[in-house]
């Protein structure tokens, strides 16, 4: 199946002034309403990572769950959930981080990973990189390492991919948008 970049991008809906004035939110729900586009997303990630040397897939709450869980299933890898504060029932590790909207906390079960594990992190998009950097910090606190950060969308003007790369975390995104791109 050929990856059609322009058709793919047309299925990501821009929502102006959401969740606050001046922000163009990239809504991926139309992408998931297209079985063909969803298959292209999953197949692209599976092909990238099928021969990669890693042990776990970490998924960011909540839209990272949509992609990473299917990729984990396809690659037969354990899934690690990184959740918003207060959503996990057992002992957790917590990490504060800044988003483009304010401060938040990311949590993971404390027994999710151990030394020697290697994780590919999945989210829907990379904006400031705050969520993925918080997840990387949690991964490292458990003695594991980050293999790569993956997302459907990169917003390079917000600098998240650069911040991740500066921390020696490679990134891979299927597409990117300029902030003013409609």
From Swiss-Prot:
Domain of life assignment: Bacteria
Listed pathway(s): Purine metabolism; AMP biosynthesis via salvage pathway; AMP from adenine: step 1/1
Family stated for the protein in its record: Belongs to the purine/pyrimidine phosphoribosyltransferase family.
Reactions accelerated catalytically: AMP + diphosphate = 5-phospho-alpha-D-ribose 1-diphosphate + adenine
UniProt protein name: Adenine phosphoribosyltransferase
Summary of the function given for this chain in its UniProt record: Catalyzes a salvage reaction resulting in the formation of AMP, that is energically less costly than de novo synthesis.
One Gene Ontology term from the biological process aspect of the record: adenine salvage
A family per Pfam: Pribosyltran
PANTHER family membership: ADENINE PHOSPHORIBOSYLTRANSFERASE, PHOSPHORIBOSYLTRANSFERASE DOMAIN-CONTAINING PROTEIN
Enzyme Commission number(s) of this protein: 2.4.2.7
């Amino acid at each position: 199946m050929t990856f059609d970049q322009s058709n793919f991008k047309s299925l990501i809906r821009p929502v102006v002034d959401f969740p606050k004035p001046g922000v163009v939110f990239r809504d991926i729900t139309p992408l998931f309403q297209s079985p063909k586009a969803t298959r292209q997303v999953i197949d692209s990630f599976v092909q990238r990572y099928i021969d990669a040397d890693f042990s776990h897939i970490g998924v960011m709450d909540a839209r990272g769950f949509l992609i990473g869980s299917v990729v984990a299933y396809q690659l037969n890898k354990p899934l690690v959930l990184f959740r918003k504060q207060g959503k996990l029932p057992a002992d957790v590790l917590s990490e504060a981080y800044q988003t483009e909207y304010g401060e938040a906390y990311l949590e993971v079960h404390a027994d999710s990973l151990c030394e020697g594990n290697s994780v590919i992190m999945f989210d829907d998009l990379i904006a400031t990189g705050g969520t993925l950097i918080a997840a990387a910090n949690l991964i490292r606190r458990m003695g594991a390492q980050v293999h790569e950060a993956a997302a459907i969308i990169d917003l390079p003007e917000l600098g998240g991919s650069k911040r991740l790369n500066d921390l020696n975390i490679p990134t891979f995104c299927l597409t990117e948008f300029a902030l003013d791109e409609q």
